[in-house]
């Protein structure tokens, strides 16, 4: 099956994938605020949310591989985050951060 990115991202599945990846990026950003040895309730809740998003992403990743034969990855830097191929030549979507 050929992937029409624009159409896919407007679908329920595509919208949910974007929502999941955006939330994962947010939770990972929140995790950076904690010390390496953090153990409090707020840390546990944040870690759990980030882990949940990662698990959901892995399901989306499998769907993309199974239906479209494309191996997408989550990519994030200080400048952007998004979903792309390993070599970052093909982006499903990319969000530039405001600096």
PLM regions: where:
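Acidic, low-complexity, intrinsically disordered interaction modules
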Residues: 20-95
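Short, charge/polar-rich alpha-helical segments
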Residues: 2-28
